[in-house]
Structure formats: structure tokens, C-alpha cells
Regions:
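N-terminal "arm"/small-domain region of PLP-dependent enzymes with the aminotransferase-like
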Residues: 1-45, 56, 177
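Conserved N-terminal alpha-helix of the aminotransferase class I/II PLP-enzyme fold
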Residues: 37-76
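Conserved beta-loop-alpha segment that forms the PLP phosphate-binding cup at the N-terminus of a helix
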Residues: 50-54, 69-93, 223
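PLP-dependent aminotransferase-like
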Residues: 88-149
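Active-site phosphate-binding strand-loop segment of PLP-dependent enzymes
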Residues: 124-190
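Conserved small/polar residues in nucleotide/adenosyl-binding loops
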Residues: 263-270
């Protein structure tokens, strides 16, 4: 299979892979311990519902002031599996992507035969989509089905503020466009511009996060999707295989949620 991400370390000698942006400070000790403990449970199937992990995620965000229930959470085998499930669940005919941007969105949209329009970001404005807000809104027309946006952007690192994100999500709701907000790098940001607080008001909003980056566990494969739209959640769940999140991944995820002090410290240091 042709490599589409990373430095292809399994076929090449790579000393420093700058294409994989994970926490250089490594895996928290408590998460390592949880993964080690998980081996004792490897002789059984994992909890198909991921009940403990969903509960931990919902309780964490509720403590942060966001009204997230366990049923709003769908864990997956990394964010990439969730992006693919979202594409198959919604079956968009036309999508808009920011460029430069994460290739994974194009990959899943091509898999469902979706036409893609690219909104080109300008280096002179630090790749800010907000600098050309009107032009972006003009591109997000009634015949658009889905819009993917990473915040902060991968690979540019641009962090859009809450005002811009709310404007875009609101515009897309009027046009009946789903917005997939990829917040996989939000944990590194001292300013929290997450759109999680908007979930209750915007049923077109889907948020995807992962434990990969901040906790330096890309090999574990663990991400999660959040949405208040029950129909969307049901369709996404139907497009995921059973037991898609291993025992090790579930226990690692719960340990990551418990390591709140680690995340705050590492976000500041990195």
C-alpha cells in the first residue's frame, strides 16, 4: 500500500519524522501502566459499547462546562476511522476543504465518490481562513453537503478563534451543510477555541478528537467523535465494525482522561 501519511518508517530508515506531530515529551507514565495492566484482559473481547471510556470523556467535558452525555460520544480506532465512517454515513455529493490541509479528509471523501472543492489559504495572511471569510462563505453554497476544518490547522498550525468558528458553523447550518471540526491538536493550545460548547445549538456540527497527539500514542489508535445529532450518531455507528476499540485502547483512553494535569502542563511546555 502506498504511504499517505508519515515518513514510512517501516520501509525506510527515518531518524526524525517531522510529518508526525506528536508530543515529543512522550507517553505519560500512568498511561503506560494502564496499557500494561490491559494485557491481563487481552484474553477477552473488549466492551463493544466502550461504556467506561464514554463515561470518562463525558464527565471530563461536563466538568469543563460542556454538556456532553455518554451517548454523544462515539470512540473509534483513531480519528481516521471516524472520518471514514462519517463519510460513509453522510454520503456527501459535494464537499469543501481548506488547502493546505490534512490529506485524510480527501482520502475518505474520494472513497465515497464525493466531488471536492478546495478553498486556497494565503500564506501572506498566515493561512488564515478568517482573512477571507466572505469568500469562504460564498463557496459554502446550498449544494455543498459537508465541510471539514481542522482547528488548529494541520499542517499550517493556524488556530481559528471562536468568533470565526461560530460564524462558519452558523452559515453552514443555514445552508444545511455538515461541519466536521477536527480538534486533534487542540490539546496543545493554551487558548481553548474548541467548538464543543456549540454542539447543543448546532445539529450540523460534528467534532472529532484523538488521544494520538497530546499523549503520544499513535500506535494505540484511539479517537472519538462528539455530536448531539442522534441520526448522525446512529448512521456513523452503523458504519463502524464491532469491537473496533481494543481493550488496551479503551484502558489507555481512560488513563489519558485521568491525566488532566499532564495535559495542562504539556500544552504549556510544548
Amino acid at each position: 500500500m502506498k504511504s499517505i501519511h508519515g515518513g514510512d518508517i517501516y520501509n525506510n530508515k527515518v531518524n526524525m519524522d517531522f510529518s508526525v506531530n506528536i508530543n515529543p515529551l512522550g507517553i505519560p507514565h500512568s498511561v503506560k501502566e494502564a496499557m500494561s495492566d490491559a494485557l491481563s484482559y487481552a484474553d477477552r473481547y473488549p466492551d463493544m459499547a466502550c461504556s467506561g471510556l464514554k463515561k470518562a470523556i463525558s464527565e471530563y467535558f461536563t466538568q469543563q462546562g460542556c454538556s456532553i452525555q455518554s451517548e454523544d460520544v462515539i470512540p473509534g480506532n483513531g480519528a481516521s476511522e471516524l472520518f471514514m465512517a462519517i463519510a460513509h454515513a453522510i454520503k456527501p455529493k459535494k464537499a469543501v476543504l481548506l488547502a493546505p490541509g490534512f490529506f485524510g479528509y480527501e482520502y475518505v471523501l474520494r472513497a465515497v465518490g464525493c466531488d471536492i472543492g478546495y478553498f486556497l489559504l494565503d500564506e501572506q495572511s498566515d493561512f488564515s481562513p478568517a482573512a477571507r471569510l466572505d469568500a469562504l462563505m460564498d463557496m459554502l453554497t446550498d449544494d455543498t453537503d459537508i465541510f471539514f476544518i481542522a482547528n488548529p490547522n494541520n499542517p499550517t498550525g493556524y488556530l481559528a478563534d471562536s468568533t470565526f468558528m461560530k460564524q462558519i458553523i452558523g452559515h453552514c447550518k443555514e445552508k444545511h451543510i455538515y461541519v466536521v471540526a477536527d480538534e486533534c491538536f487542540m490539546g496543545f493550545c493554551e487558548k481553548n477555541y474548541s467548538v464543543l460548547s456549540l454542539l447543543c445549538d448546532y445539529d450540523n456540527l460534528i467534532v472529532v478528537r484523538a488521544f494520538t497527539k497530546l499523549f503520544a500514542i499513535p500506535g494505540v489508535r484511539l479517537g472519538y467523535m462528539l455530536s448531539k445529532n442522534e441520526a448522525v450518531r446512529q448512521n456513523v455507528q452503523r458504519n463502524l465494525p464491532e469491537w473496533n476499540v481494543s481493550v488496551l485502547a479503551q484502558m489507555a483512553g481512560e488513563a489519558c482522561i485521568r491525566a488532566v494535569s499532564y495535559t495542562h502542563l504539556r500544552a504549556h511546555e510544548t
